[in-house]
């Protein structure tokens, strides 16, 4: 299985545990994907982006996935907010991961969904869901933007995709509160 070394070039601040690991530690592509999703690990994300190629290559892959308004312009962390996307495109991406056999292999889709079921931050959309709901998701936080996007599976079997992105003053708690409240309203409507 292919591995990548954690060099100082990739080590970055912000989210994730890789920033604290020994230089030249080797990580499989799968482990990097797991850390990118479950911890929002910026170092793992940057390593995987270079595995795809240049920023041009990363953005071409994004276009190939049918995402026209999503663009990566800089490495993570991107506190300036130069990378951008839309809630609609995140929803489309989630649909493709969950349902589209032409998007990724079944094995890759299963791995991604498994990782999404083990995200460490469950204080956003997940906090607004009813008891027994399963949530497969990915969070993002750059201080002035807070987001959560995922697939909800209610105890009654209803399934839906939800994406909530909140602009906010830097690290303001109101962004989190908004996402939790919106999640609760959506959940109560969807599981009727």
What does each model-found stretch correspond to?
Residues 1-11, 55-59, 105-108:
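Short, well-structured active-site flanking segments
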Residues 9, 37-40, 51-52, 67, ...:
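Active-site-proximal beta-strand/loop segments in catalytic clefts of secreted hydrolases
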Residues 12-47, 55:
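Conserved catalytic neighborhood of penicillin-recognizing serine enzymes
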Residues 28-32, 39-44, 73-78, 131, ...:
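Flexible glycine/proline-enriched surface loops and loop-helix/loop-strand junctions
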Residues 33, 45-100:
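Mid-domain, small-residue-enriched loop/turn segments at the edges of structured enzyme/sensor domains
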């Amino acid at each position: 299985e292919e591995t990548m070394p954690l060099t100082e070039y990739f080590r970055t601040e912000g989210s994730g545990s890789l920033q604290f690991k020994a230089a030249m530690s080797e990580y499989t592509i799968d482990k990097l994907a797991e850390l990118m999703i479950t911890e929002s690990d910026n170092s793992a994300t940057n390593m995987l982006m270079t595995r795809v190629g240049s920023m041009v290559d990363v953005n071409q892959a994004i276009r190939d996935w049918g995402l026209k308004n999503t663009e990566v312009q800089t490495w993570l962390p991107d506190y300036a907010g130069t990378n951008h996307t839309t809630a609609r495109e995140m929803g489309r991406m989630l649909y493709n991961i969950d349902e589209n056999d032409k998007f990724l292999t079944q094995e890759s889709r299963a791995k991604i969904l498994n990782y999404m079921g083990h995200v460490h931050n469950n204080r956003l959309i997940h906090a607004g869901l009813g008891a027994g709901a399963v949530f497969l998701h990915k969070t993002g936080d750059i201080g002035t933007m807070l987001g959560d996007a995922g697939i909800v599976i209610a105890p009654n079997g209803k399934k839906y995709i939800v994406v909530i992105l909140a602009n906010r003053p830097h690290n303001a708690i109101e962004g989190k509160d908004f996402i939790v409240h919106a999640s609760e309203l959506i959940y109560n409507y969807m599981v009727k």
